[in-house]
Amino acid sequence: MLLEFTYTKKEYADGWRRFFFLTKVIKKFDLVVMAFSLLIPLYLFYQYGFTRFYIMLAFVIYFFNIVIVAVFFIRPYMFYQEYEQLHHPYKLLFEDDKITFDAHAIHSTLSWDIYKHYMENKDYFYIIQKKRTYALIPKRIFASENELSAFRQLLTDHLTTP
């Protein structure tokens, strides 16, 4: 099965963020905790005033939240900009015994063994090599539900789901 596509910046960033949720690196509850943690310093300042300890605590909490926001929202876009090959068309040929990968300056033939399992959500397939190394396949590239099902079956024949 031949798949051809070009990532958009928004699509790549969206796939990156959704992978965090899919693999439970970040859970929705974590985002709620982050939002409430922003209120803690305000409450402490209101109740106890602007002491040195509470000011330092506020800096730590806000720094932590800024780092999480940067990793979750900004880093995917930066990664897309940094790697030129993400801007060019990808051609992936999935066969029973191998996967042929052709993208910009990268041409390689891989055995299925390089990948451990696959995951999917409503918009993407993630073909996972290591814990955080994966190939992102947008589902928008499939012309029909039959093609999508055939690709899913091909993945199921060669890989497991975690």
Task: Tell where the protein language model's regions lie, with residue ranges.
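N-terminal membrane-targeting/pre-transmembrane regions
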Residues: 1-40
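Short, surface-exposed beta-strand-loop junctions and turns on beta-sheet-rich folds
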Residues: 106-109, 116-118, 132-135, 143
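Juxtamembrane "helix-exit" motif on the non-cytosolic side of transmembrane helices
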Residues: 42-50
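Phosphoinositide-dependent membrane-docking surfaces
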Residues: 99, 108-125
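Hydrophobic alpha-helical transmembrane segments
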Residues: 49-63
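A membrane-cytosol interface segment of integral membrane proteins
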Residues: 126-162
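Conserved beta-hairpin
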Residues: 68-109
